[in-house]
């Protein structure tokens, strides 16, 4: 099966269900507190993918009746779903395609004034943050979920993604500062002439 360019959301959901059975709401909550830092998805997208995963036979749904509460559907990964997840994880033929709207806009920012661009770069780190609630909150959420991890070694990889996000934010701040410095130097040279 070819994975290059294929939407990754379904594999993210399979990965979450591989940790344990969940309802659609629980998947959305865990997704929001973990994968959403690097792979954004709307609730409607997740539910649409769940339907496709069930149709493919990669997950199954068990209807559970509850007293004094609405019934719920508990979702679990099937053996076929586990095989698909592992095949996707082992596939290293496809290159991760980088589509970065920030870089596209930066490439053409010469159409804006230096002052507008200085403002753009000053606001960039806050606007492009990976962790809107702060890195400490992200670390705390990751630590909380790690308590429920079926295997501490698997939870280590969650930490790796948090670390990547922290380093990305640091890189973005440093890069923005350098862009501002360069633009201010150009601005000062132009006013000196």
Describe each region flagged by the PLM:
Residues 1-98:
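Basic helix-turn-helix/winged-helix DNA-binding cores
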Residues 39, 114, 121, 128, ...:
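Amphipathic alpha-helical coiled-coil segments and their boundaries
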Residues 178-193:
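Long amphipathic alpha-helical coiled-coil segments
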């Amino acid at each position: 099966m070819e994975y290059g360019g294929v939407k990754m959301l379904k594999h993210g959901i399979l990965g979450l269900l591989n940790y344990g059975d969940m309802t659609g709401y629980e998947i959305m909550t865990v997704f929001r507190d973990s994968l959403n830092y690097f792979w954004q998805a709307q609730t409607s997208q997740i539910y649409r993918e769940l339907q496709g995963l069930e149709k493919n036979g990669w997950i199954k749904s068990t209807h559970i009746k509850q007293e004094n509460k609405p019934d719920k559907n508990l979702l679990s990964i099937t053996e076929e779903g586990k095989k698909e997840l592992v095949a996707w994880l082992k596939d290293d033929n496809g290159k991760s395609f980088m589509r970065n709207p920030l870089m596209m806009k930066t490439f053409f920012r010469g159409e804006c004034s230096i002052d507008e661009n200085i403002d753009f770069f000053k606001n960039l780190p806050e606007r492009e943050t990976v962790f809107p609630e702060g890195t400490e909150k992200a670390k705390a959420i990751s630590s909380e979920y790690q308590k429920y991890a079926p295997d501490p070694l698997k939870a280590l990889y969650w930490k790796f993604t948090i670390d990547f996000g922290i380093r990305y934010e640091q890189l973005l701040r440093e890069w923005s500062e350098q862009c501002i410095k360069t633009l201010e130097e150009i601005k000062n040279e132009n006013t000196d002439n």
